[in-house]
Amino acid sequence: MKLWLPILLAVFVIAAVPVAEPPVWKAGAASAKITPEKAMWMAGYAGRTKPSEGVELDLFAKAFVLTDQAGGRFVLITMDLIGVPRNLRLAVAERVKKEHGIEPANLAINASHTHSGPELRTSKIHGTDDLALREKEAAEYTAQLENTLVRLVGEALQKSVPAHLDYSTARCGVSMHRRTPDGKGGWSNFPNPNGPVDQTVPVLKASSADGKDIAIIFGYSCHCTTLGHQKFSGDYAGYAQQEIEKAHPDAVAMFANGCSGDQNPYPRKTMELAQTHGKSLATSVQAALETHMQRIKGPIRAAYREIPLAYDKLPTREQLLEEQKSTNTWQVTHATRVLQRIADEGPLSTTYPYPVQVLRLGNDLTWVTLGGEVVVDYSLRLKQDIKDPIVWVSGYTNDVMAYIPSLRIWQEGGYEGGGAMIY
């Protein structure tokens, strides 16, 4: 009996060891620096009067490729930039399909919306002495960016290995509603602690079969506007990614901005605050990683539509000519630009091809991406209406053309409710 006792104990010990769950995905990620190599005009603030003056924090583009057991794929690209020009998305999607067989519906490109990155869209510039130079620099940068994004997708595919995918969530208090009644029937851009927010931090981690980190993808609904200086920087989102990659050196950290149209980080204005906000967000991500994360299964299902979103009212020629007499330089620029477009291309379109995309991972996670500067009402409403276990909502994806107000904000007016269109 004494001889059998060690054998029986060994059998029980072996039986008690859990069987490792085999990976059901393949995943890979890649990253590249996209900081301009020379001074450029910066995007985000209309009041800037000169080009950039150095680098505070490098800008990055990153790609994540997920493959299910049936060979279905999904690609997420994130960028430390103001937005996603429509033509860039179309060009990258076409090349990714041609080179890798991935359908455009299965590609999402999200911008962090940092206001400390290079100018990509020059269509709203008019009448400046250096217009031709600014257009040339923006076009050259965007062409180089296109090549980088396509290359990153290929690198992420090459690096793909069998992987697990896990999800959790946390909260972060950096954001605050930024629309405050001005006492005169309007709205000012000012912190409003009583306004709606979505301070959820969704986190998706891809790891290899042996537990090595591949990618840590996280989201948050907040403008990247802590900073207002003349140096390139990813703002708080860039610092958050930096902190996560320090703590997880094998991982590519990727930030997907949410519905941030009416959300700002507070307090603002200094590099130290951007770093503090970034560390706060990174701490929330780490908290999510330390929970009992939910294992995500496949398959991948994705859908993409460009809906004909109708404009409210198109300006008449008479209204535009009257606007050209304004003392507001931006109104004059807006009117002149629209008149020139009518002269070159004919009548204005009555609709805009607005991108809406849905990614579903099995029956576990539904990720909705929307174009433009979407206000937080959309995130809150979609999470309420969609009954799936996990709902993740991102704005600033596939095209960033304008603010997208909710009906409430449209009726209230103000900057996000139509006032920003001249910029």
Role assignments for model-derived ranges:
Residues 2, 7-23:
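Bacterial Sec-dependent signal peptides at the C-terminal "C-region" and cleavage site
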Residues 281:
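Anionic-ligand-binding alpha/beta catalytic cores of soluble enzymes and soluble regulatory domains
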Residues 21-110, 114-252, 256-276, 289, ...:
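Conserved beta-alpha junction segments in alpha/beta enzyme cores
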